[in-house]
Amino acid sequence: MKLFNIILSAALIMGLVTSCGSGNSKKAKDDGFVSIFDGKTTTGWRGYNKPAFPAEGWEVVDGTLHCIESGTGEAGNGGDIIYDTKLSNFELDLEWKIGKGGNSGIFILAQEIPNEPIWKSAPEMQVLDNDNHPDAKLGKDGNRMAGSLYDLVPAKPQNAKPFGEWNHIHILCYQGTVVYSMNGANVVEYHLWTEDWKKMISDSKFKDFPNVLNPAKEGFIGLQDHGNDVWYKNIKLKILQ
């Protein structure tokens, strides 16, 4: 995916990178990334469609954000969470680890729609135990496997690590171009607000969700509570303008 390198190089050469203004972020490093999760508190995060961080269902443990297995299905306990700053052009870098048979997701440009789940509002990067969750065998050409644009574009190469192991993720969102990288390889690229995007969504189960068909220009980063154990750590952000 050569476009990723072209866009990123242009941003760096033109000096478009700025530091994130979040109050809980650590001082920017030389690479422009700042931490948006300090590994000790939930400062800067809150529940989706909620004013505060969930009182149960999520915990900070051993430097991670842990969604606790509930056995009650999607958003059955704490619910989805969001980083409480709207973003437009950025790079997101983090690590995730899934429990056996687990499912979760990472959202960008998410919107808060009352009484609706987060997945109806934004593109989702799939987080999954490919070996033990049935979703891995559904969809088309592996587009429900880890690292994929969920149910739309399969991650290729499919290089997710098994449950219990850490996966390193990088997401670039810049002027409508989105690139997912997993464990050092670019695995998905798509282009928002284009005719190709609109056709892909119109032919999918998301066709009736206007915020997916025509995503917002800015929105929240979200982490999904799908009722399964999942851990996130080393969550860092670089703002691109």
Q: Model-predicted segments: where are they?
A:
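Carbohydrate-interacting regions of secretory-pathway proteins
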Residues: 20-241
